[in-house]
């Protein structure tokens, strides 16, 4: 065989990867969210099920990325004041690193039900720790207070979704669902951006603007009410 004196692929134009603009954002709609939460409430009262339930509900209530959540220590959560400090993340080899971006460093307010749930979870975790001679520092650790593998938790999530009769999705769907709930409740995009830790407001708007269906539908009624108020004044 003889060597070709030129590269035949030199002038080949490699097609650019298409943007994911048309890709559907995965989140739990109202029906599937209700179905999944009902399923969680009916699980046998084992610590493993309680752990999973608290993890899912914490993600849903805060919009945290899964690796931000798995990096949490109890010292990051002020149960008395109802705040959660996001300042680190857990990488794929279970090492603690800095957050994704500077804007990812944030303090999130917790609702009362989530605070109560975390109090109950901490008490149950502490009881198990006493039996094992451990004091748990990490919120979502394994039995020995070591960081847990997110991939194993993903496998458990898939099993729960199948049993609940819900479509399959990843942990990130909880984040999208959180944003969707806040958006349709009327929270401004800027507040959602800060809560999610997005670097730019445009990022939040690009990702979630099409989820504001309720707000879009309400726009006409807001207009009608404004006109009627103007007429009657």
Q: Which ranges hold each PLM region?
A:
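Proline-centered turn/helix-capping motifs that create local helix->coil transitions or kinks
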Residues: 1-8, 78-82, 123-132
């Amino acid at each position: 065989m003889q060597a070709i004196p030129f590269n035949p692929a030199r002038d080949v134009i490699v097609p650019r990867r298409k943007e994911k603009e048309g890709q559907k954002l995965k989140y739990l709609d109202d029906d599937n969210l209700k179905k999944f939460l009902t399923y969680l409430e009916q699980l046998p009262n084992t610590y493993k099920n309680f752990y999973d339930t608290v993890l899912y509900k914490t993600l849903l209530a805060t919009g945290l990325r899964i690796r931000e959540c798995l990096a949490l220590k109890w010292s990051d959560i002020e149960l008395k004041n109802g705040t959660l400090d996001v300042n680190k993340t857990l990488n794929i080899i279970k090492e603690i690193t800095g957050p994704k971006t500077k804007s990812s460093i944030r303090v999130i307010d917790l609702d009362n039900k989530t605070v109560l749930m975390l109090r109950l979870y901490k008490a149950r975790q502490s009881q198990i720790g006493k039996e094992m001679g451990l004091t748990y520092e990490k919120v979502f650790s394994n039995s020995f207070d070591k960081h847990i593998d997110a991939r194993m938790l993903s496998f458990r999530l898939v099993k729960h979704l199948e049993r609940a009769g819900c479509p399959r999705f990843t942990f990130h769907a909880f984040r999208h669902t959180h944003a969707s709930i806040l958006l349709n409740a009327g929270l401004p995009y800027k507040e959602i951006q800060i809560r999610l830790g997005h670097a730019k407001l445009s990022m939040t708007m690009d990702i979630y603007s099409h989820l504001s269906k309720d707000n879009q539908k309400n726009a006409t009624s807001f207009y009608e009410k404004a006109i009627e108020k103007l007429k009657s004044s």
